[in-house]
């Protein structure tokens, strides 16, 4: 109640100060004081009944959260109650100002209407917003919870499968998950189940088994039900976890295979729709007398929906745990380079529309220079990702050698790594993380994706508990299987990347050849009387029309940038590392026509 009273006092003081600036000077002090006193009385009544209001809000929202399978945060009902009181007080304050204005001689009619509209809009919008928050927030939280649990479910199964080979019980395994930095959603879920266990006076495993009934995800319900039943009746869930994880890993593989199949179709549509525009511009555009600016506008209008639809398709099908998470510096430089490219496209469209000439060699040199830092950072980042791949192979080889020689696993890992500095640094970090939890947090945070974050954390946990060699062999087997699934997909997408590069180069060369051939044919045609060729033939002398050439170059650039971003998104799950592919496609797409322009400039 004290908090609500403070809110009422703050609104009253704010209204008193604002009324001194808003009200006309000829209004006496009596009327505002009376209305302020009325506002204080209204606020006091609201603050007095705020406890009852909060209790009703708590009961209503708790029921909605329970329906969504989640426990409402304790402060949630208080925040909603504060929002309700603030909305009502603000609306009443505006009504008080409206009342004073009505009794003020010569008050502007517009001010009266404005205060009335603001008061009604504030009250309606505030109550509507609070109602939506109270009704939809449990469903939104439930949706986020289901999505997060599904994203991390393969790696939860990997951890449970690895540690089911040890002496740890299912309770101990979930306690490890509770402290996990790689599986944040499941760590929060276990903490939440632990609070439920304390409230209901049951064990942690019993509280976790409740997920089989109230979790919003059907897949999570099925997995938890099978694991907890096996842990309760069989003592060890090893067999069930292995079967479930194998099924789920195969599901991931099939998802990536479907994505690869869809990408053949989607990228075929992308390259056909985007690169067909410049081809048509140089072949039938002159006959139809299409303005150069229209070519650029059509390219942009086609590229925007094609990019959004294809990007959404990839985002929905690509497993989130396999997506790379580049550092902020790489994202920043890539964003800046994209902004430079967009700026060049807009500038080109403006200059083409106004008919002003510009040098495309200088313009595209600026674009290539803007991509250079992003390319360098992307290459450095991908080299770091490759170090994690080599580290996984080192684990595989070291466990096989340790089974024969019986040597210490970490020492064998250093020997197998040899002179690979990046891998040796990862080994040193893992060894330090065994005794220093801050190093473990840093290793997980710096991992390129959830796959490697989970692998590193599982390896650290296994070293901490002194797990037998069989556990490390299981780590190598599980994560090598996951990595092989991802590697096959990325290998296929590299083939798609090279195929598209060849197609783009062919389209660029074809456009340049058609410009040269059609221009030469049109320029060489003479009428029998020696008069100038017809106007339609003059339109085909594209080589002498700089605006048409600039329009074709801009259209090719739009197609190259969009295709490069989508190919990289399908390969790694992010477009932030696409600077290299974008640069290659950009160079290939404009080389033919740009070479023709350079040849003509040198010829002059």
Per-region residue spans from a language model:
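Bilayer-spanning, highly hydrophobic alpha-helical transmembrane segments
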Residues: 4-16, 81-100, 123-133, 252-314, ...
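Short, non-transmembrane cytosolic segments of multipass membrane proteins
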Residues: 33-52, 209-236, 440-468
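Juxtamembrane/interface alpha-helical elements of multi-pass membrane proteins
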Residues: 59-71, 112-212, 333-445, 454-457, ...
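Membrane-cytosol interface segments
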Residues: 1-70, 375-383, 596-604
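Cytoplasmic membrane-interface regions of multi-pass membrane proteins
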Residues: 49-73, 102-106, 137-141, 238-242, ...
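Hydrophobic alpha-helical transmembrane segments
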Residues: 4-5, 21-38, 107-125, 292-302, ...
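Juxtamembrane "helix-exit" motif on the non-cytosolic side of transmembrane helices
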Residues: 17-26, 96-106, 283-288, 347-355, ...
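Membrane-anchoring hydrophobic segments
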Residues: 1, 157-272
